[in-house]
From Swiss-Prot:
Catalyzed reactions: 3-methyl-2-oxobutanoate + (6R)-5,10-methylene-5,6,7,8-tetrahydrofolate + H2O = 2-dehydropantoate + (6S)-5,6,7,8-tetrahydrofolate
Species this chain originates from: Cereibacter sphaeroides (strain ATCC 17023 / DSM 158 / JCM 6121 / CCUG 31486 / LMG 2827 / NBRC 12203 / NCIMB 8253 / ATH 2.4.1.) (Rhodobacter sphaeroides)
PANTHER family noted in UniProt: 3-METHYL-2-OXOBUTANOATE HYDROXYMETHYLTRANSFERASE
Name the record gives this protein: 3-methyl-2-oxobutanoate hydroxymethyltransferase
Keyword Transferase belongs to the record: yes
């Protein structure tokens, strides 16, 4: 094989094969520059509908449209070469029927080049997952806290405590048996997440779940510390980019007002002297 041969991107079968092995690494991305950074280190790059809140300032993910997901999916695809690109199906794009879900999943895959779609829901979405998988659409499932159902759930609460644990377990079994290649467990208690991971044959990807899941996902902007006042319990900050950006912008503003920027090295001379400019 030539050393210049393109790298084969990660595929659904590769993720399935990681069950019980080295933990799977996933982060969200919404732009080309960030996608390049994520792609260098992660197995999965997720264009999450969280972009509605993170990028567009919406209060929930419910206002996210197919057009928004396609636009950001295309941008992320331009920065992705080795990780598996997964794009969220937005609220209202798949719940009506399996046929509706396939039409929109087909559009996402055709227009973004993504390798899989993610949709929220457990037992009630199993038929749709099965329908999509049978037609060549790899599906990442998402159970536990499902943000698109925030109004029905009464907020962003932990799911699966007490008697509710059986429901979440049954959701996990249902999506696995329907053919999903992995499942996100969001805000599911540690012990239950471990039991689900042991019980089902597909990889579990935790977010606010357990270190014993088969992998982890975080929202990139959260783990980079871009939002000063948003500190959910399940997010570890690996950087403080918000503070760094604030300092840089403040310094720029001060230097412009003091006429210290642009300095001589940042401007062009009226006449060429020596090297061409």
């Amino acid at each position: 094989m030539s050393v210049n041969s393109p790298v084969r991107p990660v595929m659904a079968a590769d993720i399935l094969a990681r069950k019980g092995g080295e933990p799977i690494v996933c982060l969200t991305a919404y732009t080309t520059p960030m996608a390049r950074l994520v792609d260098a280190h992660c197995d999965l790059t997720l264009v999450g509908d969280s972009l509605g809140m993170v990028v567009h300032g919406l209060p929930t993910t419910l206002g996210v449209t197919m057009e928004m997901m396609i636009l950001h999916g295309q941008a992320v695809a331009r920065g992705t070469s080795r990780s598996m690109l997964v794009v969220d199906m937005p609220f209202g794009s798949y719940e009506e029927s399996p046929a509706q879900a396939f039409a929109n999943a087909r559009r996402l895959m055709a227009e973004t080049g993504c390798a899989a779609v993610k949709l929220e829901g457990g037992q009630h979405m199993a038929e749709t997952i099965r329908f999509l998988v049978a037609r060549g659409v790899p599906v990442m499932a998402h159970i536990g806290l499902t943000p698109q159902a925030v109004n029905a759930l009464g907020g962003y609460k932990v799911q699966g405590r007490g008697a509710d644990a059986e429901r979440v377990m049954e959701d996990a079994i249902a999506v696995a048996e329907a053919g999903a290649f992995s499942v996100v467990l969001e805000k599911v208690p540690d012990g239950l997440s471990q039991r689900i991971t042991q019980r089902i044959a597909i990889p579990t990807i935790g977010i606010g779940a357990s270190a014993h899941c088969d992998g982890q996902v975080l929202v990139l902007d959260d783990m980079l510390g871009l939002f000063a006042d948003f500190r959910p319990k399940f997010v570890k900050r690996y950087g403080e980019l918000g503070a760094s950006a604030d300092e840089a912008i403040a310094t720029y503003a001060a230097e412009v007002r003091a006429r210290r920027f642009p300095a001589p090295e940042h401007v062009f001379a009226d006449e060429l002297k020596g090297k061409a400019q």
